[in-house]
C-alpha cells in the first residue's frame, strides 16, 4: 500500500531524511516514533503529497509521488496535530463543504453517518469554534474519513489533548483501523500508542533505525525498544 525507497529530503544545505526505506502493507497500523526534529512530520507531509522529496521513490496505492499527487489524494485521509477547521461554520457545514470538495456521493447521508461515528451528532449544528480541542480533533478525523480513504495519516493527533480527550481519540483510532484501513501515525507518546499499533518504527537521524511488531515486543516493553533504537 505504501512503498518508499531511498528517500532523501533536503531544506537548503540541511538534509532531514537520509535514504529512508519504508513499507506498509494494506491494513497495517504503523506508528512512527522519534524525538522532536527527527523528520517525522516532514516524512508524513511527503506521503500526503504536501511536500516534494529531493530524491527517492515514493508510492502510495501503486501511484508514484509526486507525479500522481491528485490521484493519490483520493486514497488518503490526513489529520494533523492542528484541526484546521472553519470555526464560524457548524460541524455539519464543515463536513458538507469537504464532501462537495471530495465529490462524495450522497453527502448529506454520509455527513450524518460520519458525525455519529465520531460522536458529534448531537452537536452537529453548533459552531466549531465553540468546540473543545478534543471535539475539534474528532471532527478533523471525521473530515479525513468522509470520502472513505484507504490510507489514513495522523501527525501527532494527541498533541494538546487532555486525558479524557485522548481516551476518546484512541477509541476512534481503533474504530478507524478496525475498518481495514492502512494507518500511519507519528507520535512521541509511547505509553499512549503502545496498545494501538501493529508495528512500531523508530525514525532517528533521518532514517528508520529500528522496527518491531507489537507481538514481538515480548518482555521488552516499547520504551525499552525505543531507547535501544535511539542508542544504536
Q: What residue ranges belong to the model's regions?
A:
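Helix-to-loop junction immediately C-terminal to a conserved catalytic motif
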Residues: 48
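Conserved ABC transporter NBD signature motif
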Residues: 56-67, 72, 210
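Conserved ABC ATPase "signature" region
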Residues: 96, 100-123
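Catalytic Walker B motif of ABC-type/P-loop ATPase nucleotide-binding domains
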Residues: 152-155
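H-loop/switch region of ABC-family ATPase nucleotide-binding domains
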Residues: 187-188
